[in-house]
């Protein structure tokens, strides 16, 4: 995923002293940024930086408005808002449990994503729903997964990968792909977002054992690509 970062200089006042000038003489110049058509000037807002939905809709809305107005004041035009960091959601979902970050793992009594879409558009910004498709948890403890997590139902199958640094969905699994696509469709059908931003869609390890059964099935079916190329193709097939 690629984001264009732009250094914006708005009305920068630059004093310049020439040799023939006296110490009391200065020259001021002004650099004014002129936006280009269709240019994306974006900022990521991670799950750790979202307003606290547990404090209620009014305070959440106030904080969201403040954040997005600040973004607009910096001459940016797009926000990538983290709506799914760990197989969760910051909106009422039929597929994923409430996020433990902004939503503290339970229904806050309102729809945070709906509020953020409204606030972003009111500030003149485009808003993309940012998801991490394969991350399930930063902990390897299965018991730490919330009730309703789709990964919890799949533990022990080839669909979920459990490592020392966390739990992940198998990037090669077509069942995983279907789940992620359904999650994206849920967002597109329910919210007037301007895009979907997919980040961190890679294999969590080089360990050859995590998808051995799937790779062997591929080879048995006549596949002739090496493991690394097959894995790259699996991710490409997902993203396509």
Task: Tell what function each PLM region has.
Residues 34-61, 128-191:
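Active-site-adjacent "subsite" loops/lids of carbohydrate-active enzymes
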Residues 62-89, 190-195:
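Catalytic domains of carbohydrate-active enzymes, especially glycoside hydrolases
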Residues 12-19:
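Bacterial lipoprotein signal-peptidase II cleavage site
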Residues 67-68, 81, 85-132, 226-240:
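Aromatic-lined substrate-binding rim segments of carbohydrate-active enzymes
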Residues 41-45, 77-82, 126-130, 195-199:
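Structural recognition of the beta-strand scaffold that forms the well-ordered cores
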Residues 71, 79, 120, 127, ...:
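Conserved, mostly hydrophobic/aromatic
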Residues 114, 154-240:
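Polysaccharide-binding and catalytic clefts of secreted carbohydrate-active enzymes
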Residues 7-10:
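C-terminal motif of bacterial Sec signal peptides marking the signal peptidase cleavage site
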